[in-house]
A protein has these predicted regions:
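N-terminal binding-site loop/beta-alpha segment at the start of enzyme catalytic domains
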Residues: 1-77, 115
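Structural motif corresponding to the early beta-alpha repeats
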Residues: 72-98
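Generic structural signal for helix capping and beta-alpha/helix-loop junctions
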Residues: 59, 86-89, 126-129
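Active-site beta-loop-alpha junctions enriched in small/polar residues
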Residues: 21-23, 53-55, 82-86, 122-125
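Generic beta-strand or strand-like secondary-structure segments
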Residues: 64-68, 82, 100-107
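Glycine/proline-rich, positively charged
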Residues: 92-137
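Conserved catalytic core of Hanks-type protein kinase domains
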Residues: 42, 82, 111
Length: 137
């Protein structure tokens, strides 16, 4: 596996990343055991960059991923999630306020069973006021 540093962060990530949207049933339903096994296999094979969002499966992807991550040493992966776009009960919402972004990070850490998240991305900024994203989010 080839690894590259993200800018000057010191974070070295695999060229192939694990996009966890499918753990939330975004494309089709997946058994939780299969989803967790997929995470284990990816990390075991050297894929150390995992990307997810609370929006994927309306929190389900983070919840399922968290069950897998609980069993993997924290130094084996770089974790990325997002703020700004959310969903619940089939309803999509966007909130780029600093307050909601901060709340979202803590909520994600709880669902993911981690003490910290390495990277936070702003999800779907085309729906946001860019001044708010730059100055507040």
């Amino acid at each position: 596996m080839i690894y590259n540093e993200i800018g000057k962060t010191g974070l070295r990530v695999s060229n192939l990343s694990f996009g966890a949207s499918s753990l939330g049933g975004v494309f089709h339903q997946i058994r939780e055991t299969e989803a967790i096994d997929a995470v284990f296999t990816a990390v075991e094979k050297g894929m150390n960059f995992i990307d997810v969002s609370p929006y994927y499966g309306h929190y389900k992807a983070e919840t399922v991923l968290g069950k897998a991550l609980k069993e993997i040493p924290r130094n084996k992966y770089i974790l990325s999630t997002k703020v700004g776009r959310y969903g619940k009960d089939g309803v999509n919402t966007w909130d780029y306020s600093g307050k909601r972004a901060t709340e979202s990070v803590y909520e994600s850490m709880e669902r993911l069973n981690v003490d910290y998240i390495d990277l936070i991305n702003v999800h779907d900024i085309e729906f946001a006021d860019l001044n708010q994203v730059v100055n507040e989010t």
